[in-house]
């Protein structure tokens, strides 16, 4: 059985790790801290194919983290980009020449420790199912 198809507005969720510079008497200490990521797919969709009335999401679709990551205890070592990109999709269904994105497919986020690891996961719901 297939998974619900992702579309513009579907969510990507993850827990990123960002390096925060924690103040100390000996100078700032780079400290990896978890940061929740939650954003809606907003770009890189296929406007000519609709899923529940919205443009279909595919591998390469992007989203923005909202609200953006907030450093706790000090400034970020490198400010996060607060963006994710869908990296996996259906092996059998193409939309606009790209793999269709579905619920539970993965995305890379702005994680500092493993920026190319697919830590994010799509959360999509609806009646259109894709295998």
Write out the residue ranges for each language-model feature.
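Intrinsically disordered, low-complexity proline/glycine-rich segments
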Residues: 1-131
């Amino acid at each position: 059985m297939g998974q619900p198809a992702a579309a513009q507005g579907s969510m990507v969720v993850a827990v990123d790790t960002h390096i925060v510079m924690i103040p100390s008497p000996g100078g700032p200490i780079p400290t990896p801290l978890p940061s929740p990521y939650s954003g809606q797919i907003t770009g890189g969709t296929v406007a000519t194919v609709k899923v529940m009335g919205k443009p279909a999401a595919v591998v390469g679709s992007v989203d923005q983290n909202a609200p953006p990551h907030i450093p706790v205890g000090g400034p970020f070592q490198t400010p996060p980009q607060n963006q994710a990109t869908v990296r996996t999709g259906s092996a059998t269904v193409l939309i606009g020449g790209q793999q269709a994105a579905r619920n539970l497919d993965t995305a890379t986020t702005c994680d500092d420790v493993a920026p190319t690891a697919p830590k994010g996961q799509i959360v999509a719901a609806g009646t259109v199912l894709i295998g």
